[in-house]
A protein has these predicted regions:
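Conserved GNAT-fold acetyl-CoA-binding loop/helix
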Residues: 1-12, 23
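A short gly/proline-enriched turn/hairpin at secondary-structure junctions
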Residues: 1-2, 17, 46
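Alpha-helical interaction segments
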Residues: 6, 14-15, 115-116
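Acyl-donor (CoA/ACP) binding surface of acyl/acetyltransferases
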Residues: 11, 24-141
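Short loop/turn motifs at secondary-structure junctions and domain boundaries
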Residues: 15-21
Length: 141
């Protein structure tokens, strides 16, 4: 990504936050402040009326439950602050840890799609506000 492309991406994220109240936010290691990725919400490319959650972390952050912490914060924002009824997410076939993450926070599998110019097979999941609230109640019990 060039500097110009990065600036354009930042501008589009700011515009999305201003118009929809959603964007991708940076993720850092709490102890060191090291940037390790991003997480957030955006309109789903297959249906812009549907909101998709995503977490994208560098390999140095894998396996430390940072993705789970970030995804839970994103879902709390979407459901508790924005009042969204449903949030979707997906992962490429073979990304078993992504599947485990989505299932751990309460997403349920819905269907597979072919995505992008290379028609990558993606497993799609969804979680509704009611399920989100019930999983949070179980965690705090």
């Amino acid at each position: 990504m060039t500097i110009e492309q990065a600036r354009a991406r930042i501008d589009s994220e700011r515009e999305r936050e201003n118009s929809l109240g959603i964007q991708y936010w940076p993720v850092f290691f709490r102890d060191t402040g090291e940037f390790v990725g991003c997480a957030g919400l955006r309109p789903w490319q297959m249906d812009p009326n549907t909101i998709e959650a995503g977490v994208h972390l560098m390999r140095s952050a894998w396996g430390q439950r940072l993705g789970e912490e970030a995804l839970r914060a994103v879902l709390a924002y979407g459901f508790d602050m924005l009042g969204l009824p449903t949030i979707v997410a997906g992962h490429g076939i073979g990304h078993d840890n992504s599947q485990k993450l989505l299932e751990r926070v309460g997403f349920g599998y819905t269907h597979n799609i072919k995505w992008g110019p290379k028609a990558i097979e993606v497993r799609m999941y969804a979680i509704g506000a009611g399920m989100w609230r019930s999983t949070r109640t179980l965690e705090s019990a």
